[in-house]
Amino acid sequence: MAQKFDSDSAIAFWSSARIPRSAAEKAFAAVDKETLVPRADHFNALKRAAAQIVAAHGVADDGPVKPYGLSGHANAVGVEVRRFIRGTTRNDLPFLFSIGALRQTDGSYRIELLEYDAAAVPQIARAHRKVEAQADQFWRQECEYLTANDLTQAITGLVKDCGGFLLRDEGVVWSMPIHMLDAYEKVADLLAPHGVQMICGICPPKVNRRLIQ
């Protein structure tokens, strides 16, 4: 004899935000899903730190700049900032400065101002020690936060673990079994104070395989 089951489903969607990493880890740990929170991306944090150095010292006042990754390895990542000068046949990209995150033997990281062109960025040259300290501060602050994209990745992982699937023609809307809502709602309650809106609603199912990804 076939057993009865509740065929109702729930729809889920959310608006993500940049939040403290500790808040995300606490929320997902509450439902034993802390491994879904992506680890800090040292390279992207370094790119954002470089952008803050550019803003703090007016490096872009003389024209647009672009960050580029330096070849690195497991224990070091680096970013260089170059001036972007559009040309008729090719663009010119003169070097301005570079910073790196270097892993120490104790597992911690040290942020260094690796190189700079004193003629191109005299404000960096005059205050290179201050710039290095700022880069270290900016980088650590960035690592302590989870980006909106990373939070979306974590929430998506949670919904998938709860048996959810994406409804293609409803935008970024997911369907999940109603009996799996507890974990979603618990994470939603813990993240709400940080400006994250996780919304869910119950609706009867309507099967259409073209909507399922």
Feature roles, as predicted:
Residues M1-A119, A125-A135:
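Charge-rich, low-complexity segments
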Residues A2, K26-R39, L46-K47, A51, ...:
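Terminal interaction module
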Residues S98-Y184:
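Internal, hydrophobic cores of structured domains that mediate oligomerization or house catalytic pockets
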